[in-house]
Amino acid sequence: MNVFTSSVGSVEFDHPLLLENDLTSLSINCDDVHCSSRALCYIYDIHSSRHPSIDEHQFLRLLHGPDDAVTLGSFLKTLIWILSHDKNLPEEYRLPTIMMSSSYVKFFTEVKPRPPSTNCWTCRMSKDNLPFTVPSVKGFPPDAELYIVPISDHDGKPVKFDNRKTLYRSPSKKRHKYVISSDKPPLSARYVKYVDSSALESSPGSSPAVL
């Protein structure tokens, strides 16, 4: 598979994929099957509608070679959706789309899993999913002794711990679930007491975290 780009001459047609990347033409050859600029722009329009976070620059980088398995997988799903569900697909784009899906699936032998997100506040603050103290939490008395207590990892696996203070359920919708340990009741009604016997019990051979 070869990706061809050009910034020389007149632009083939007015489309953001070309204009935003300062290109006049863009094409791919997959096993001697030519995928034109128009076909790639058509695919981009559908892919960006399914994944609004991707822009023209990211899509061009994707065409040259995906960075991770998640990005590659979402692109292949778009190609498959086009072939199986897109009733407006021009017939001349069908074979190039088939060949692209066949070529890009081979990238799975090269790409690596996406690294864990560093945007999770709990992961940054907690070492090995252990409770950690915080100076304040909105909705709790300013003089309360407060801890953030992770109760599951990102895969949903419960975290074992031995608690000696009252726990309150956080209204947070974050994937890394946690509760708040406080020696004083909250001032806000949105926090309610949390009880989970499976998380409070220590399994044989484990060393639960102690507050």
From Swiss-Prot:
Function: Acts as a suppressor of RNA-mediated gene silencing, also known as post-transcriptional gene silencing (PTGS), presumably through the binding of dsRNA.
Assigned keywords, A-Z: Host cytoplasm, Host-virus interaction, Inhibition of host innate immune response by virus, RNA-binding, Suppressor of RNA silencing, Viral immunoevasion
InterPro entries registered for this protein in UniProt: Tenui_movmnt_prot, Tenui_NS3
Protein name, per record: Suppressor of RNA silencing p3
Quaternary state and interactors: Homodimer.
Similarity comment: Belongs to the tenuiviruses p3 protein family.
Keyword RNA-binding: yes
GO terms for biological process, alphabetical: symbiont-mediated suppression of host innate immune response
